[in-house]
Amino acid sequence: GPGAAFGWRGSSRIPARRRDARHGVLAVSGLVLPDPATAYRVGVVVPPSNPVVEPELDVLLGDEILQYGARLPRFTGLSLEERNQRYLPAYAEALDQLYGLDVTCALVAMTGPNYQLGLDGDRALCAELTERFGAPVSTASLAIYRTLNSLGINRIQLLSPYPDWLTGETVRYWEGAGMTVVAVEHLLGEGQAFSAYETCTEEVVAHLQSVEPEADCAVLVTGTGLVSVASIYQMDYGCSRPILSSNLCGAWWILQQCDRSPGSRLYREIAPGHVPCEDPGPDCGPGCHEL
């Protein structure tokens, strides 16, 4: 029947629908379905080969928020450094692909290209894109900064999937933003090529476990193509040792734009220990960062 795709097999009629108490959600035969007419809509600009952003945001944002993606162009035959130069002016064209969707906000899920700009340049870029797009726009790098600023943290330990030259740009960005980078853990070995998209959760967890967390310091897993949600979930530093990632901070920023939507159940489990918390849970310790 017409409802087979939603698991309504064996029924000759479409079940009665009822609106869930949550924003933009319909409950149909026990299934929770987002209602595109009333759900929050958000745009996400993604690198062409990045397989991580949409799945991680999807499990963090919850049923009240629908994400609509626009992929950046594929630049073949160029080095990572050359691609990073070309991505920056391509953000605006990618956002144009979302025209007519009336999105609440848009996240440019990129960090690497933005680090060459420094914080002030990143802010200026997002302000320009916001004005052009007509809705709030943030890069993932600026979302990380806003998260750190809201947490009141100015010391970070960096987990970098980048080659040395881009790790250097990353460190300069954060130091220019007023952060003290106390340590850098490299995912790449000597002479190894950029491979964040092929890095599995177990590898990220192993590197995180090798980091000796310091007091009043956040561990930053940078790069939207690096698997982070499952990695953070498996770690147990406690609330006083937040682990931040590009996608977790991007999700936090999106939720703030969507009237501080609570996010998914998984997000609500992770958030109290790592990002500013709207409603801390009973298991959150003394280091919890309440808004």
Q: What would you call each of these model-derived segments?
A:
Residues 26-93, 164-200:
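N-terminal glycine-rich anion-binding loop in soluble enzyme alpha/beta folds
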Residues 245-284, 288:
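C-terminal functional extensions of proteins
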Residues 205-238, 249-251:
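Hydrophobic alpha-helical
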Residues 125, 129-190, 271:
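Conserved beta-alpha
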Residues 98-136:
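Glycine/small-residue-rich loop that forms an oxyanion/phosphate-binding "nest" at active or ligand-binding sites
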Residues 104-109, 157-159, 216-223:
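Periplasmic-binding protein-like
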Residues 88-101, 203-216:
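Short, well-structured alpha-helical segments in soluble
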